[in-house]
Amino acid sequence: MTDNKPLAGQTALVTGASRGIGAATATALAEAGAHVILVARRVKALEEVEDRIHEVGGTSTIAPLDLTEPDAIARLAGAVAGRWDTLDILCIAAAYLPELTPLSQIEPKEYQQAIMTNVVATQALLSAFDPLLRRAEKGRVIGLTSSVGDTPRPFWSAYGSTKAAFDNLLETYGQEVARLSPLRVAIVDPGATRTDMRARAYPGEDPDSLKPPEKVASRLVELLTEGFEAGHRERID
């Protein structure tokens, strides 16, 4: 580890790494010295992120994957375990935003997709990578949440309910592992950020009024470098 490469020698896995906050975080982690496993569905988009990582002098491995496919996460964990003895950092940035609509008009398929991505996949990730995270000297998990998970808003019930479950999974896991290992779990609300998901939710909003994903990524790297206590939560404004 050096001052300009504080995460040198560490391995990180980022879901939702093909765009937005996930892509920015993956790039920032690599620039800080970590080898980053990039997980998302779109190969071309992952390759573009990998190119940016190479431009900043970092290294990465592409892992194209649909987190909602049966056994996909278990296969990924097996592949990672076959190459690395530990996983130092798990950043869960993947999320699915269903159409904003009154609760009575939620489309079942949309809601199911949100549940599978935001809830079921999260539990599967924590379970599958638990052994590798515990083997790390100081394993860390960061989950990116949303304020609608604990502050219900009209038309946001489909997404908000899945983020509430997301938070519960992470908080519970964090309490469980804190008693038995140095592994720590944090939940971070990135706040209003210039992403495609934000543009879908607020189509009339001026994107220039929002902070870029890189600001969120910078804070996450800072948090991972400095370390954090069990149960850490914060919002990035």
Predicted regions and their residues:
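Conserved glycine-rich Rossmann-like NAD(P)H-binding loop of the short-chain dehydrogenase/reductase
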Residues: 32-48
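Catalytic loop of short-chain dehydrogenase/reductase
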Residues: 96, 134-179, 192
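Conserved mid-core segment of classical short-chain dehydrogenase/reductases
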Residues: 74, 95-112, 155
